[in-house]
C-alpha cells in the first residue's frame, strides 16, 4: 500500500476546498468516505469493547466463533443482506464517494459475503479500508486487501 504524504497534514481541510465551498453555499456535499457496518456480530468477546456496553443493541452478540456462526444462521437480521450491501456500494460509487470503510459494531469479516463486498468496492473504483480483529480471513481476502488503502487490525482484540 502506498501512503499519501498529505494524510497527516494539518492543512488536510484545504485539500477539499470544493466541499467547504459547498457547505458555505448551504449545499450538501457528497461524503469523501462512507463507513459501512455490514454486521453487528463479533467472534470475540473483548471486555473493553464499546459495542458490548449496555444500551447497544449488539451487546449480546459477542462471543466464541461457534456461537457467532450459530447466531448468523439463526438471525440474518444481524447483518445487512448481500444484495442491499451491493446496492449501497453501487449508490456510493454513483454519487462519487471516494472511499468505503468496512468497520465495527461487530467484526466485518463475519459477514459471509465480505470477500465479495471488498472486491466489489474495488471494482467500483472506490478505495477500500477495513477495521478488523484479523481472525476471520477467508482464502483470497489478504490479496484483495493488499489492493486497499489501509487495514487497521485491533491487536488488543
Feature annotation, model-predicted:
Residues 1-73, 90-93:
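N-terminal pre-core extensions flanking Radical SAM catalytic domains
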